[in-house]
């Protein structure tokens, strides 16, 4: 199936590893060009090389918590490629731990990067996106049900999901679509880190997969393919939707 994105340009934050990098690979594989960002310059350089070099990718070292980063990333995309057709906003997981131990500073820092950083980028990109443009927010099952020991994510991501839904209403008349990805257990470094916090990581994995109807974790590539489809014109009538990719783990509709 031709996704109709040959030559289009997509900006992906958190695009140097995990879900963001998988989405970048899927988009480039369909002929798109990508702008990938990360706070780490070495990670940016490595991802850019893996994605095919300057003809296909622009790598940017940027921090979503920086109030100027969103405008700078959009400007860089336009300067390098001359256009911007879509954005995938993926932000690294905030600190783990129970609410009773998370400090005010941790809450503020996480709000800046996870919540405000995401909305700043959507706000900066919206005016320059074409009528068939698309914005995707990478969220998690904590949008629908709290996960143990990730209280900050449980607190922030549901609000971001509702903001995405609102943005879909606002941008819909221009033809710009906005969707969220409600991501379950995907085999990323972040998930491995959460497992390692347990006394017995192997047991934690066995217990978690036993609760997933498909009895396994998803792969970043499975997410990347879905993200590419939803960001593309193939999904031209899909907006304001929270799309689950969780192996059936969520026990509600």
Q: Model-flagged regions — what are they?
A:
Residues 98-99, 103-111, 208:
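Substrate-binding pocket helix/loop in short-chain dehydrogenase/reductase
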Residues 127, 169-173, 236:
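Alpha-helical segment proximal to the catalytic Tyr-Lys
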Residues 228, 239-253:
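Short C-terminal tail/terminal secondary-structure segment
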Residues 53-67:
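Rossmann-fold cofactor-recognition segment
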Residues 182-194:
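Short, flexible catalytic-loop segment of classical short-chain dehydrogenase/reductase
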Residues 16-18:
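Conserved glycine-rich cofactor-binding loop
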Residues 136-160, 164-173, 185-186:
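Catalytic loop of short-chain dehydrogenase/reductase
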């Amino acid at each position: 199936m031709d996704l109709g994105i040959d030559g289009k340009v997509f900006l992906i934050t958190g695009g140097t590893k995990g879900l963001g990098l998988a989405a970048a690979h899927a988009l480039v594989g369909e002929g798109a060009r990508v702008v990938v960002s990360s706070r780490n310059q070495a990670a940016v350089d490595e991802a850019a090389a893996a994605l095919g070099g300057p003809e296909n990718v622009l790598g940017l070292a940027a921090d979503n918590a920086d109030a100027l980063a969103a405008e700078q990333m959009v400007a860089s995309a336009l300067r390098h490629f001359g256009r911007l057709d879509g954005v995938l906003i993926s932000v690294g997981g905030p600190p783990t731990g129970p609410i009773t131990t998370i400090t005010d500073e941790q809450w503020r820092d996480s709000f800046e990067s996870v919540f405000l950083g995401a909305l700043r980028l959507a706000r900066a990109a919206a005016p320059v996106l074409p009528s068939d443009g698309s914005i995707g927010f990478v969220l998690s099952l904590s949008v629908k049900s709290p996960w143990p020991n990730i209280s900050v994510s449980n607190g922030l991501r549901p609000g971001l999901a509702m903001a995405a839904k609102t943005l879909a209403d606002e941008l819909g008349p221009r033809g710009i679509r906005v969707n969220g990805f409600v991501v379950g257990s995907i085999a990323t470094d972040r998930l491995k880190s959460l497992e390692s916090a347990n006394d017995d990581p192997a047991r934690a994995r066995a217990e978690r997969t036993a609760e997933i109807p498909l009895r396994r974790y998803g792969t970043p590539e499975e997410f990347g393919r879905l993200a590419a489809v939803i960001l593309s014109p193939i999904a031209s009538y899909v907006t304001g939707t929270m799309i689950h990719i969780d192996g059936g783990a969520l026990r509600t509709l």
